Amino acid sequence: MPTAGKASWRELLRQGEHLLRRRARPDPCEDAGTDAFLLMQAAGGPDRSHYPLQKNDPCPPTLREKYLALLRRRAAGEPVQYILGEWEFMGLEFKVGPGVLIPRPETEQLAEQAIESLRGRPKCRVLELCGGSGCIAVSVAKALPAADITVLELSPDAMRYLRENIARHGVKNVTAIQGDALCPPPGIAGPYDAILSNPPYIASGELAHLQKEVQKEPVMALDGGGDGLKFYRGFNTIYPKMLAPGGLLLYETGEEQGEAVAALLQKAGLREVRILRDAYGQPRNVLGYAPEKP
């Protein structure tokens, strides 16, 4: 890195990107440029709106050292989201850190689909399973303020972030309950107008082959059992019967799991079962509806 006190922000940013690309081998940082900029900003550097005017300004030595420390953490494989302590989902900022699954852009499709499906039921009851940081529930609650939303989460670490994010966004219509989604506590009872989940769906044997950053996330939020379908099978015996007539069951799935999960929903008697593809054409969500009253 350049000599302390003499480097401009532009020089530091270029050096930071180089450091991430070089030290992240053999698992390279695909977004080295973006990560280097975000960490520079977190260290006290200019944001994107001010960078063009300030990029040639010298960086104070104290901020340079702070930036270097953040870069080293990222180069060692720590997710940039954990380093920053928050991440955006559906235009909202959520607190994240070790012990909770990081919100991902592809999961926004689940939240968007839920909101679209429930707009005609403004006072709906919604249950989310394996709620993690609360990004899905809070996003739905902000869009549907009259909805009554319950979030079930087992992990004590994730519950801390879940409750903090509920409070942070001031959504009074979201209730967090700690419990096992495969053995729901007594407070979980239908009928629900929608049941949503982004459950663990990575096959156990694949966990060791995940990217270094993903391996820093909690195993219990990733491990879906031998074939990745453990939670879908377990949910299938519990939650379809908790749906109100015409109620929605909506899951996120792995790219190779759509057909298997759709078959489970059909087996449970749901109708209009569909597999939804993401922006890249990959299967991403499976949904189905409870039968209407005869």
Language model regions located:
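Conserved SAM/SAH cofactor-binding pocket of Class I
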Residues: E106-A208
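Residue-level signal for inorganic ion chemistry
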Residues: L39, G77, T107, I136, ...
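Conserved hydrophobic residues forming the short capping helix/wall of the S-adenosyl-L-methionine
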Residues: L20, L118, I166, Y239, ...
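Active-site beta-alpha loop architecture of Rossmann-like, nucleotide-cofactor-dependent enzymes
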Residues: Q81, I202-G205, E256
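Non-catalytic accessory regions of SAM-dependent methyltransferases
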Residues: M1-R48
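Conserved AdoMet
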Residues: M40-E116
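Mobile active-site "lid"/loop adjacent to the S-adenosyl-L-methionine
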Residues: Y201-F231
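Conserved Class I SAM-dependent methyltransferase catalytic core
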Residues: G226-A290
